[in-house]
């Protein structure tokens, strides 16, 4: 079993934010161990309602707490600057109800936003 430095990590910006962590700080601290990157954002209005009304994680997801990069509160330029030299895949995620958020529309939005953030971060 791999442990310590031999263990690679998946950086999931949405889950990190949901759990109270800073995705940029995680990217900085574990840069050399990150081998996968799931990019999703958190809608602050849904998160506030979830917190104030005591929703479960599943209820929050079903209510649309997650969205594509650039449609929420995460500073992707900051995260990407911490990932200088990363050469793995970046997976755009949203974990949204397709009846509420049309998948092709949000996939295009996430790709466009992430492409812009990559340029703003000086990576492309």
Question: Where is each model-derived feature located?
Answer:
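Histidine-acidic metal/acid-base catalytic patches
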Residues: 2-11, 15-124
């Amino acid at each position: 079993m791999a442990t310590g430095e031999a263990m690679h990590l998946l950086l999931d910006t949405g889950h990190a934010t949901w759990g109270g962590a800073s995705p940029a700080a995680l990217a900085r601290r574990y840069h050399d161990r990150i081998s996968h990157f799931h990019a999703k954002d958190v809608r602050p209005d849904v998160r506030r309602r979830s917190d104030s009304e005591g929703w479960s994680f599943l209820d929050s997801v079903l209510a649309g707490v997650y969205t594509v990069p650039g449609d929420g509160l995460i500073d992707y330029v900051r995260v990407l600057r911490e990932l200088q030299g990363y050469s793995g895949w970046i997976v755009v995620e949203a974990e949204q109800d397709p009846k509420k958020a049309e998948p092709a529309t949000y996939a295009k939005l996430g790709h466009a936003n992430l492409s812009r953030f990559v340029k703003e971060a000086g990576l492309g």
